[in-house]
UniProtKB/Swiss-Prot annotation:
<keyword id="KW-0722">Serine protease inhibitor</keyword>
<dbReference type="GO" id="GO:0042151">
    <property type="term" value="C:nematocyst"/>
</dbReference>
<comment type="similarity">
    <text>Belongs to the venom Kunitz-type family. Sea anemone type 2 potassium channel toxin subfamily.</text>
</comment>
<feature type="disulfide bond">
    <location>
        <begin position="32"/>
        <end position="53"/>
    </location>
</feature>
<feature type="site" description="Reactive bond for trypsin">
    <location>
        <begin position="17"/>
        <end position="18"/>
    </location>
</feature>
<dbReference type="GO" id="GO:0004867">
    <property type="term" value="F:serine-type endopeptidase inhibitor activity"/>
</dbReference>
<keyword id="KW-0646">Protease inhibitor</keyword>
<feature type="disulfide bond">
    <location>
        <begin position="16"/>
        <end position="40"/>
    </location>
</feature>
<dbReference type="GO" id="GO:0005615">
    <property type="term" value="C:extracellular space"/>
</dbReference>
<dbReference type="InterPro" id="IPR050098">
    <property type="entry name" value="TFPI/VKTCI-like"/>
</dbReference>
<dbReference type="Pfam" id="PF00014">
    <property type="entry name" value="Kunitz_BPTI"/>
</dbReference>
<feature type="domain" description="BPTI/Kunitz inhibitor">
    <location>
        <begin position="7"/>
        <end position="57"/>
    </location>
</feature>
<dbReference type="InterPro" id="IPR002223">
    <property type="entry name" value="Kunitz_BPTI"/>
</dbReference>
<keyword id="KW-0166">Nematocyst</keyword>
<protein>
    <recommendedName>
        <fullName>PI-actitoxin-Axm2b</fullName>
    </recommendedName>
</protein>
<dbReference type="InterPro" id="IPR020901">
    <property type="entry name" value="Prtase_inh_Kunz-CS"/>
</dbReference>
<dbReference type="InterPro" id="IPR036880">
    <property type="entry name" value="Kunitz_BPTI_sf"/>
</dbReference>
Length: 61
């Protein structure tokens, strides 16, 4: 297992009601996808940009 196992966690909005567009790595599609983050809670599969998500979670060949 890699140190980036959190990339395979589901996207979690969290319990707050904010509206923060974020990105998560989807293990189903193998791509970084947009979701809405509530502002608190959640997990580490939560990135401010698709680029940050990709550089962290895309499998290295």
């Amino acid at each position: 297992h890699s140190s980036n196992d959190f990339c395979y966690l589901p996207a979690v909005r969290g319990r707050c009601r904010g509206y923060f567009p974020r990105y998560f790595f989807s293990s189903e599609t193998g791509k970084c996808e947009r979701f809405i983050y509530g502002g608190c809670g959640g997990n580490r599969n939560n990135f401010e940009s698709a680029q940050e998500c990709g550089s962290t979670c895309y499998p290295r060949e």
